[in-house]
A protein has these predicted regions:
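N-terminal zymogen propeptides
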Residues: 46-107, 126, 150-160, 165
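Bacterial N-terminal signal peptides
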Residues: 34-44
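Loop/turn elements at helix/coil->beta-strand transitions in domains of secreted/extracellular proteins
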Residues: 117-121, 232-237, 267-270, 297
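Active-site-proximal segments of metallohydrolase catalytic domains
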Residues: 174-262
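Catalytic cores of secreted/periplasmic or lumenal enzymes
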Residues: 266-373
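Active-site-surrounding "flap" and adjacent substrate/cofactor-binding loops of secreted or lumenal enzymes
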Residues: 120, 129-195, 323-327
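Bacterial N-terminal signal peptides that target proteins for export
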Residues: 21-35
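Solvent-exposed loop/turn segments at secondary-structure junctions
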Residues: 127-132, 170, 242-248, 276-281, ...
Length: 373
């Protein structure tokens, strides 16, 4: 079986490793904001960076800081507060850039910018723990239902994503798409789920590395028979780790999930590192929309929905649609609890799921619902 190429990129190119211990959210939002300010006050911040120079990965509280392979990472809710406070301290212009600058096309990588066809999501449940107590909250069934439901029942959450495009007629730096002659992100009218694999041949590592996660995506492509670049053109592989594991340091790092891609003899393979997010409770979205037992799995649909949407619009980072600072469509709308773009239940053909909004260039805001283009 082919192994991933050395170009998996997305090796750690830093030497810096800023890690914050993640604790469940128990304090009030004002208390968390005060704590964030106190932490910021303890940093030697130096001269402020200009808005033109600042990148998302420059924020020391961002999951991508020192780990630039963590594309579109969902920060824990605590980390998001720290990130926003750091932006504030370093000047409102930087914060405005990250929140309000439109997404622009990155020109594509290997001719690929977005998933300009019907999305195909392959769920990969990584490790024998999935059949031995590694799924105490029923996440496997929930995720299968989520991706089966997307695009059904007239849901318009997916509509926001369909405005983004790629192709030879789309110039690098474009912020709009010609609806008549450019291929756009496809709408999954019969659901996005293309396959499910419980890879129980061996236990999932306690702390899977990026190389192990990328290799699991390659293994999944082989399992599903997707062994050509054409068969992977509109595919994404969600590598879901079981409860009690810490892929890429999950639990001691400051993220809930991230996406990336690897190269292989099967073509470029987009994949998501999807930890068992209920292990971090409210920090990764438990009960963010729904109270009690109804919201126990909110984090799985919010976080995986974030990464799914970003993979569709920036399939091989960062050749797709990002801001000048490196944010993707999900990053701009993460953890909004009220007002425009607030996370909400999205009704699909098989039920309702807690989802976050995503950025819409054509309305200049975070939209939880949008016309299908």
């Amino acid at each position: 079986m082919p192994r991933l190429s050395h170009r998996t990129a997305h090796d750690n190119r830093n030497g810096r490793n800023h890690v914050n211990t993640v604790k469940h959210i128990k304090a009030s939002r004002p208390a968390l904001a005060a704590a964030a300010a106190a932490v910021i006050g303890g940093l030697a911040v130096g001269a402020a960076l200009s808005a033109d120079d600042l990148r998302l990965a420059d924020n020391p509280f961002a999951p991508a800081y020192g780990h630039e392979y963590r594309h579109g990472a969902v920060p824990t809710r605590e980390a998001k507060l720290h990130m926003d406070e750091w932006d504030r301290v370093h000047g409102a212009s930087a914060a405005r850039l990250r929140r309000h600058t439109v997404l622009a096309f990155g020109g594509g990588i290997d001719g690929i910018g977005v998933t300009s066809g019907t999305p195909k999501v392959y769920l990969v449940f990584y490790g024998s723990q999935w059949t031995g107590g590694g799924d105490p909250n029923g996440a496997a069934t929930y995720l299968q239902n989520l991706f089966t439901g997307l695009g059904t029942g007239g849901e318009h959450w997916s509509g926001t994503i369909t405005q983004y495009c790629d192709g030879p007629t789309v110039p690098r730096g474009a912020t709009t798409c010609n609806t008549a002659n450019t291929p756009h992100v496809g709408y999954p009218s019969v659901g996005a789920l293309a396959g499910v694999w419980f890879d129980t041949a061996a236990p999932s590592p306690s702390s899977a590395t990026i190389s192990q996660l990328a290799q699991e995506a390659v293994n999944a492509a082989a399992h599903f028979g997707n062994t050509t670049a054409a068969s992977n053109r509109y595919a994404q592989y969600v590598v879901v780790s079981p409860s009690g594991t810490h892929p890429d340091g999950f639990g001691s790092a400051n993220f809930c999930a991230w996406h990336s891609y690897t190269t292989s003899s099967y073509g470029d393979l987009p994949y998501t590192n999807m930890p068992y997010v209920t292990d971090l409770g409210a920090s990764c979205g438990e009960n963010f929309v729904n109270p009690g037992s109804a919201g126990r799995l909110d984090g799985f649909s919010i976080v995986n929905g974030h990464e799914y949407a970003e993979t569709l619009t920036d399939q091989l980072p960062a050749g797709g649609w990002t801001t000048r600072s490196g944010s993707e469509n999900g990053d701009l709308c993460a953890w909004i609890s009220s007002g425009q773009g607030a996370a909400a239940n999205v009704s699909m053909g098989n039920g309702a799921y807690a989802m976050q909004s995503t950025w819409s260039n054509d309305t200049s805001q975070c939209d939880i619902s949008h016309n299908i283009l």
